[in-house]
Amino acid sequence: HAGIRAILCLETSDRRGQKAMMRQVEENVSFWEQHRKNPFLAGMFGLHANITLSAETLSFISRSKPKEMPIHAHCGEASVDLDFCRAEGFAGPVDRFSSFGLIDGDSFLIHCVHLGEEDYRILKETGAVVVLNPESNANNRVGLPGRERLPGHILGTDGMTGDILSALRSYYLLGEGNKEPFPRMEDMMFRRPAKILSRRLPGVFGFHPGAAADIAVLDYVPLSPIRESNLLGHLLFGAKGGRAYLTAVNGRILWMKGEFPEHDILTLRREAQRSARKLANRFQSR
């Protein structure tokens, strides 16, 4: 209803039992089928992580989902994921998913902090998309990924926040000696995601006459000049916080000057607070 574009999936695992897992599989596939030609919504097949997915479940998923339906999976976030896969007889978390025919060039593999040598080989061979989440990894104390071995990676937040500029700054500051020239970071932040997303939502991405007017204007007035060579520096150290002055999707203004023109923000906040209280009460009652 808000009008944003999204690529969505439901996290599938064995944690709630077989019947729930089968419902999760059905929902993922039906959502993907329903939105195959929708310019605003697309689906993927959501997987939690190797440690919560049995061999029987992965085999069932491989048989149930359309071959061309890509997966979104947490992969090698913590060392326990790598240890589990090796104990199961695989080289690592990517190798285990791959052995069930689930990895291709459209797969989204999230984290990839703890991988084996065969995992890196499969990533290179398939061109699967690796999404790094520096703030989440730091929060969970799981270590840092080997960026130099993941040349095609893009940036994410793991749902910890909705602030991608904050994630970009953390990525830069947590580099641990990695040289991060701005052109390479611009590829990670802008060009590579646009290319990847254009395969899911064709004809949407671009900044040229005739392209869909999907635009975010930051609430940032620079004191020093902005040039192509220092744009990323302004995003890292000047416009940090990611607060938008205006957001438009397909030319429709969704947010402007701290307000939703088409929605009552007070009503939305009350609904969000009510949902948050219900969730908190569920945890506290356990």
PLM region descriptions:
Residues 3-5, 65-70, 102-105, 122-131, ...:
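Glycine-enriched alpha-helix->loop->beta-strand junction motifs that scaffold or abut catalytic
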